[in-house]
Protein backbone atom coordinates (compact mmCIF):
# COMPACT_ATOMS: atom_id res chain seq x y z
CA UNK A 1 0.00 0.00 0.00
CA UNK A 2 1.25 3.48 -0.85
CA UNK A 3 0.15 6.38 1.31
CA UNK A 4 0.45 10.06 0.36
CA UNK A 5 -0.53 9.04 -3.16
CA UNK A 6 -2.13 11.30 -5.76
CA UNK A 7 -4.15 9.62 -8.53
CA UNK A 8 -4.09 10.76 -12.14
CA UNK A 9 -6.68 13.54 -12.08
CA UNK A 10 -7.30 13.73 -15.84
CA UNK A 11 -8.88 10.28 -15.99
CA UNK A 12 -12.41 9.56 -17.24
CA UNK A 13 -14.42 6.43 -17.94
CA UNK A 14 -13.15 5.03 -14.64
CA UNK A 15 -15.05 2.99 -12.04
CA UNK A 16 -15.97 3.75 -8.44
CA UNK A 17 -17.61 1.74 -5.66
CA UNK A 18 -18.17 2.41 -1.95
CA UNK A 19 -17.44 -0.13 0.75
CA UNK A 20 -17.61 1.04 4.34
CA UNK A 21 -15.48 4.17 4.61
CA UNK A 22 -13.55 3.65 1.37
CA UNK A 23 -14.38 4.67 -2.19
CA UNK A 24 -12.49 2.35 -4.54
CA UNK A 25 -11.47 3.57 -8.00
CA UNK A 26 -10.02 1.65 -10.92
CA UNK A 27 -9.24 2.08 -14.60
CA UNK A 28 -10.25 4.82 -16.99
CA UNK A 29 -8.88 6.74 -19.97
CA UNK A 30 -5.97 9.15 -19.54
CA UNK A 31 -5.35 11.72 -22.32
CA UNK A 32 -1.99 12.71 -23.71
CA UNK A 33 -2.13 16.30 -22.49
CA UNK A 34 0.44 17.58 -25.00
CA UNK A 35 -1.71 16.83 -28.06
CA UNK A 36 -5.23 16.45 -26.64
CA UNK A 37 -6.09 20.08 -27.32
CA UNK A 38 -5.74 19.38 -31.07
CA UNK A 39 -8.36 16.60 -31.10
CA UNK A 40 -11.55 17.74 -32.86
CA UNK A 41 -13.67 14.56 -32.92
CA UNK A 42 -14.25 13.18 -29.42
CA UNK A 43 -16.52 10.29 -30.48
CA UNK A 44 -13.60 7.99 -31.30
CA UNK A 45 -10.35 8.69 -29.53
CA UNK A 46 -7.32 7.06 -31.22
CA UNK A 47 -4.79 5.33 -28.99
CA UNK A 48 -2.11 7.93 -29.69
CA UNK A 49 -4.27 10.54 -27.98
CA UNK A 50 -4.97 8.58 -24.81
CA UNK A 51 -4.00 5.52 -22.81
CA UNK A 52 -5.95 3.28 -20.45
CA UNK A 53 -5.25 3.32 -16.74
CA UNK A 54 -4.24 0.40 -14.57
CA UNK A 55 -4.37 2.40 -11.34
CA UNK A 56 -6.32 0.97 -8.41
CA UNK A 57 -6.75 3.04 -5.24
CA UNK A 58 -9.23 4.26 -2.68
CA UNK A 59 -10.26 7.49 -1.00
CA UNK A 60 -10.57 7.20 2.78
CA UNK A 61 -13.82 8.92 3.74
CA UNK A 62 -13.48 8.17 7.46
CA UNK A 63 -11.41 11.34 7.78
CA UNK A 64 -12.16 14.95 6.79
CA UNK A 65 -10.62 16.50 3.69
CA UNK A 66 -10.86 19.73 1.72
CA UNK A 67 -11.11 19.92 -2.03
CA UNK A 68 -9.21 23.21 -2.22
CA UNK A 69 -6.15 21.63 -0.58
CA UNK A 70 -4.05 18.57 -1.30
CA UNK A 71 -6.08 15.50 -0.36
CA UNK A 72 -3.93 13.21 1.77
CA UNK A 73 -6.43 10.40 2.21
CA UNK A 74 -5.77 8.58 -1.08
CA UNK A 75 -4.27 5.09 -0.75
CA UNK A 76 -2.68 3.36 -3.75
CA UNK A 77 -3.41 -0.36 -4.21
CA UNK A 78 -2.07 -0.68 -7.75
CA UNK A 79 0.71 -3.02 -6.66
CA UNK A 80 -1.81 -5.76 -5.80
CA UNK A 81 -3.93 -5.40 -8.95
CA UNK A 82 -3.88 -8.06 -11.68
CA UNK A 83 -6.23 -6.22 -14.05
CA UNK A 84 -4.78 -5.07 -17.38
CA UNK A 85 -5.26 -1.43 -18.37
CA UNK A 86 -8.98 -0.86 -18.92
CA UNK A 87 -11.89 1.58 -18.99
CA UNK A 88 -15.71 1.63 -19.17
CA UNK A 89 -16.13 -1.52 -17.06
CA UNK A 90 -18.99 -2.60 -14.80
CA UNK A 91 -17.81 -2.33 -11.18
CA UNK A 92 -19.86 -3.04 -8.06
CA UNK A 93 -19.68 -4.08 -4.45
CA UNK A 94 -21.47 -7.37 -5.00
CA UNK A 95 -19.85 -10.45 -3.59
CA UNK A 96 -19.88 -12.95 -0.76
CA UNK A 97 -20.22 -11.43 2.72
CA UNK A 98 -20.47 -7.94 1.18
CA UNK A 99 -16.69 -7.66 1.13
CA UNK A 100 -15.98 -8.33 -2.55
CA UNK A 101 -15.74 -5.90 -5.44
CA UNK A 102 -16.66 -7.34 -8.82
CA UNK A 103 -15.56 -5.93 -12.18
CA UNK A 104 -16.73 -7.13 -15.57
CA UNK A 105 -15.76 -6.33 -19.13
CA UNK A 106 -15.10 -2.95 -20.62
CA UNK A 107 -12.47 -1.76 -23.05
CA UNK A 108 -9.10 -3.48 -22.63
CA UNK A 109 -7.67 -2.25 -25.94
CA UNK A 110 -5.85 -5.06 -27.71
CA UNK A 111 -5.31 -7.12 -24.55
CA UNK A 112 -8.80 -8.36 -23.72
CA UNK A 113 -8.53 -11.22 -21.18
CA UNK A 114 -10.26 -14.55 -21.79
CA UNK A 115 -12.12 -14.34 -18.49
CA UNK A 116 -13.81 -10.96 -18.18
CA UNK A 117 -14.70 -11.11 -14.47
CA UNK A 118 -12.25 -9.87 -11.85
CA UNK A 119 -12.96 -9.93 -8.11
CA UNK A 120 -11.21 -8.12 -5.27
CA UNK A 121 -11.48 -9.36 -1.70
CA UNK A 122 -11.24 -6.30 0.52
CA UNK A 123 -10.43 -8.45 3.54
CA UNK A 124 -7.49 -10.43 2.12
CA UNK A 125 -6.53 -7.64 -0.33
CA UNK A 126 -6.39 -10.14 -3.20
CA UNK A 127 -7.57 -9.97 -6.81
CA UNK A 128 -8.81 -13.05 -8.67
CA UNK A 129 -9.76 -13.71 -12.30
CA UNK A 130 -12.18 -16.63 -11.92
CA UNK A 131 -13.54 -18.87 -14.65
CA UNK A 132 -17.30 -18.32 -14.90
CA UNK A 133 -20.09 -20.29 -16.56
CA UNK A 134 -21.97 -18.81 -19.50
CA UNK A 135 -19.89 -15.66 -19.97
CA UNK A 136 -21.58 -13.19 -22.36
CA UNK A 137 -19.86 -11.19 -25.07
CA UNK A 138 -17.77 -8.29 -23.85
CA UNK A 139 -19.89 -5.23 -23.10
CA UNK A 140 -19.48 -1.66 -21.97
CA UNK A 141 -22.09 -1.12 -19.31
CA UNK A 142 -23.14 -0.01 -15.86
CA UNK A 143 -24.16 -2.48 -13.19
CA UNK A 144 -26.31 -2.61 -10.10
CA UNK A 145 -26.20 -5.21 -7.36
CA UNK A 146 -28.96 -6.88 -5.39
CA UNK A 147 -27.23 -7.47 -2.06
CA UNK A 148 -29.90 -9.95 -0.95
CA UNK A 149 -29.10 -12.38 -3.76
CA UNK A 150 -25.58 -11.34 -4.73
CA UNK A 151 -26.62 -10.82 -8.35
CA UNK A 152 -25.34 -8.10 -10.68
CA UNK A 153 -27.61 -6.74 -13.40
CA UNK A 154 -26.15 -5.25 -16.60
CA UNK A 155 -28.32 -3.98 -19.44
CA UNK A 156 -26.38 -2.96 -22.52
CA UNK A 157 -25.36 -3.40 -26.10
CA UNK A 158 -22.31 -5.43 -27.09
CA UNK A 159 -19.18 -3.65 -28.24
CA UNK A 160 -19.56 -4.64 -31.90
CA UNK A 161 -23.34 -4.88 -32.39
CA UNK A 162 -26.48 -2.98 -31.49
CA UNK A 163 -28.12 -6.01 -29.88
CA UNK A 164 -29.59 -5.38 -26.44
CA UNK A 165 -29.08 -7.81 -23.58
CA UNK A 166 -29.87 -8.07 -19.88
CA UNK A 167 -26.98 -9.99 -18.37
CA UNK A 168 -27.28 -11.27 -14.81
CA UNK A 169 -24.20 -12.49 -12.94
CA UNK A 170 -24.57 -14.60 -9.80
CA UNK A 171 -21.49 -13.70 -7.77
CA UNK A 172 -21.98 -16.68 -5.45
CA UNK A 173 -22.08 -19.44 -8.07
CA UNK A 174 -20.05 -17.50 -10.70
CA UNK A 175 -22.81 -18.23 -13.20
CA UNK A 176 -24.23 -15.99 -15.93
CA UNK A 177 -27.89 -15.79 -16.85
CA UNK A 178 -30.10 -13.56 -18.96
CA UNK A 179 -33.16 -11.50 -18.14
CA UNK A 180 -36.26 -10.92 -20.20
CA UNK A 181 -36.20 -8.45 -23.10
CA UNK A 182 -39.99 -8.39 -23.51
CA UNK A 183 -40.95 -4.73 -23.31
CA UNK A 184 -37.31 -3.68 -22.94
CA UNK A 185 -36.06 -0.43 -24.49
CA UNK A 186 -33.56 -0.43 -27.31
CA UNK A 187 -30.00 -1.25 -26.38
CA UNK A 188 -28.12 1.74 -25.05
CA UNK A 189 -24.95 2.88 -23.36
CA UNK A 190 -23.72 5.95 -21.48
CA UNK A 191 -26.76 5.78 -19.17
CA UNK A 192 -27.16 5.51 -15.40
CA UNK A 193 -28.76 2.60 -13.55
CA UNK A 194 -30.21 2.97 -10.05
CA UNK A 195 -31.77 0.15 -8.01
CA UNK A 196 -34.73 1.26 -5.89
CA UNK A 197 -35.71 -0.52 -2.63
CA UNK A 198 -38.81 -1.98 -4.35
CA UNK A 199 -36.67 -3.90 -6.84
CA UNK A 200 -37.03 -1.61 -9.85
CA UNK A 201 -33.89 -0.57 -11.71
CA UNK A 202 -34.32 2.96 -13.07
CA UNK A 203 -32.48 3.72 -16.32
CA UNK A 204 -31.79 7.39 -17.01
CA UNK A 205 -30.12 8.99 -20.01
CA UNK A 206 -27.80 7.36 -22.48
CA UNK A 207 -27.35 7.20 -26.21
CA UNK A 208 -30.57 6.16 -27.99
CA UNK A 209 -32.74 7.07 -25.01
CA UNK A 210 -36.04 8.87 -25.40
CA UNK A 211 -39.54 8.90 -24.00
CA UNK A 212 -40.64 7.48 -20.63
CA UNK A 213 -38.13 6.10 -18.12
CA UNK A 214 -37.51 2.33 -18.50
CA UNK A 215 -37.83 0.19 -15.37
CA UNK A 216 -36.65 -3.38 -14.92
CA UNK A 217 -38.04 -5.29 -11.94
CA UNK A 218 -35.53 -7.78 -10.55
CA UNK A 219 -38.23 -9.52 -8.49
CA UNK A 220 -40.31 -10.78 -11.42
CA UNK A 221 -38.00 -10.24 -14.42
CA UNK A 222 -40.31 -7.75 -16.17
CA UNK A 223 -39.94 -4.44 -17.96
CA UNK A 224 -42.23 -1.44 -17.65
CA UNK A 225 -41.97 2.29 -18.20
CA UNK A 226 -42.76 5.35 -16.14
CA UNK A 227 -44.12 8.57 -17.58
CA UNK A 228 -42.83 11.42 -15.44
CA UNK A 229 -44.22 14.80 -14.43
CA UNK A 230 -42.59 18.11 -13.58
CA UNK A 231 -39.46 19.55 -15.15
CA UNK A 232 -38.26 18.21 -18.52
CA UNK A 233 -34.49 17.60 -18.27
CA UNK A 234 -32.19 17.93 -21.25
CA UNK A 235 -31.51 14.47 -22.76
CA UNK A 236 -27.96 13.48 -21.86
CA UNK A 237 -25.32 10.82 -22.16
CA UNK A 238 -23.06 9.55 -19.37
CA UNK A 239 -24.28 11.54 -16.39
CA UNK A 240 -23.98 10.10 -12.90
CA UNK A 241 -26.74 9.25 -10.45
CA UNK A 242 -27.00 8.54 -6.74
CA UNK A 243 -29.99 7.51 -4.62
CA UNK A 244 -30.75 9.28 -1.35
CA UNK A 245 -32.52 7.69 1.61
CA UNK A 246 -35.69 9.65 0.86
CA UNK A 247 -35.97 8.35 -2.70
CA UNK A 248 -34.32 11.12 -4.70
CA UNK A 249 -32.25 10.08 -7.71
CA UNK A 250 -29.78 12.94 -8.11
CA UNK A 251 -28.52 13.11 -11.69
CA UNK A 252 -25.40 15.17 -12.39
CA UNK A 253 -23.66 16.18 -15.60
CA UNK A 254 -23.67 14.44 -18.94
CA UNK A 255 -23.16 15.45 -22.55
CA UNK A 256 -25.55 16.51 -25.33
CA UNK A 257 -23.59 15.82 -28.53
CA UNK A 258 -21.41 12.71 -28.38
CA UNK A 259 -19.14 13.91 -31.20
CA UNK A 260 -18.34 17.10 -29.27
CA UNK A 261 -19.35 16.15 -25.72
CA UNK A 262 -21.09 19.49 -25.26
CA UNK A 263 -22.13 19.83 -21.60
CA UNK A 264 -25.76 20.06 -20.55
CA UNK A 265 -26.82 23.40 -19.09
CA UNK A 266 -29.16 21.88 -16.49
CA UNK A 267 -26.42 19.75 -15.03
CA UNK A 268 -28.12 18.95 -11.71
CA UNK A 269 -31.61 17.48 -11.91
CA UNK A 270 -33.54 15.34 -9.44
CA UNK A 271 -36.03 12.51 -9.94
CA UNK A 272 -38.37 11.95 -6.98
CA UNK A 273 -39.30 8.24 -6.97
CA UNK A 274 -41.36 8.17 -3.77
CA UNK A 275 -44.80 8.69 -5.32
CA UNK A 276 -46.82 6.51 -7.68
CA UNK A 277 -45.65 8.83 -10.47
CA UNK A 278 -42.02 9.95 -10.64
CA UNK A 279 -41.42 13.71 -10.67
CA UNK A 280 -38.49 15.61 -12.18
CA UNK A 281 -37.19 18.90 -10.83
CA UNK A 282 -34.24 21.13 -11.54
CA UNK A 283 -32.13 21.35 -8.40
CA UNK A 284 -31.89 24.71 -6.67
CA UNK A 285 -28.16 25.32 -6.09
CA UNK A 286 -27.25 28.25 -3.86
CA UNK A 287 -23.47 28.08 -4.35
CA UNK A 288 -21.05 28.36 -7.24
CA UNK A 289 -20.91 25.14 -9.27
CA UNK A 290 -17.90 23.39 -10.80
CA UNK A 291 -17.66 23.07 -14.58
CA UNK A 292 -20.22 20.55 -15.79
CA UNK A 293 -18.74 17.22 -16.76
CA UNK A 294 -19.38 13.76 -18.13
CA UNK A 295 -17.63 10.38 -17.85
CA UNK A 296 -17.08 11.10 -14.15
CA UNK A 297 -18.08 9.10 -11.06
CA UNK A 298 -20.40 10.05 -8.20
CA UNK A 299 -20.73 8.23 -4.88
CA UNK A 300 -23.08 9.14 -2.04
CA UNK A 301 -21.45 9.09 1.40
CA UNK A 302 -23.98 10.00 4.09
CA UNK A 303 -25.57 13.12 2.54
CA UNK A 304 -22.49 14.09 0.52
CA UNK A 305 -22.26 13.29 -3.18
CA UNK A 306 -18.58 12.94 -4.02
CA UNK A 307 -17.85 13.57 -7.70
CA UNK A 308 -14.44 12.56 -9.04
CA UNK A 309 -12.58 13.26 -12.27
CA UNK A 310 -14.34 13.11 -15.66
CA UNK A 311 -14.28 15.45 -18.65
CA UNK A 312 -15.61 18.91 -19.32
CA UNK A 313 -13.78 19.48 -22.62
CA UNK A 314 -13.08 23.07 -21.73
CA UNK A 315 -9.60 22.28 -20.49
CA UNK A 316 -7.40 19.59 -19.05
CA UNK A 317 -6.71 20.39 -15.39
CA UNK A 318 -3.22 20.92 -14.11
CA UNK A 319 -1.81 17.78 -12.54
CA UNK A 320 -1.59 19.68 -9.26
CA UNK A 321 -5.34 20.35 -9.13
CA UNK A 322 -7.83 18.24 -7.24
CA UNK A 323 -10.63 17.03 -9.49
CA UNK A 324 -12.89 16.02 -6.60
CA UNK A 325 -16.09 17.92 -5.83
CA UNK A 326 -18.61 17.62 -2.98
CA UNK A 327 -22.34 18.29 -3.18
CA UNK A 328 -24.30 18.61 0.06
CA UNK A 329 -27.68 16.96 -0.65
CA UNK A 330 -29.12 17.19 2.87
CA UNK A 331 -31.65 19.91 1.97
CA UNK A 332 -33.68 18.94 -1.10
CA UNK A 333 -34.69 22.56 -1.57
CA UNK A 334 -31.14 23.94 -1.37
CA UNK A 335 -28.20 21.98 -2.76
CA UNK A 336 -24.70 23.29 -2.04
CA UNK A 337 -21.30 22.60 -3.58
CA UNK A 338 -18.90 22.72 -0.66
CA UNK A 339 -15.14 22.43 -0.26
CA UNK A 340 -14.92 20.36 2.93
CA UNK A 341 -15.97 16.79 3.65
CA UNK A 342 -16.76 15.98 7.28
CA UNK A 343 -17.68 12.37 8.12
CA UNK A 344 -21.02 12.03 9.85
CA UNK A 345 -20.50 10.47 13.26
CA UNK A 346 -22.80 7.55 13.99
CA UNK A 347 -24.95 7.99 17.07
Kindly label every feature range from the protein language model.
Residues 1-347:
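Kelch-like beta-propeller repeat domains
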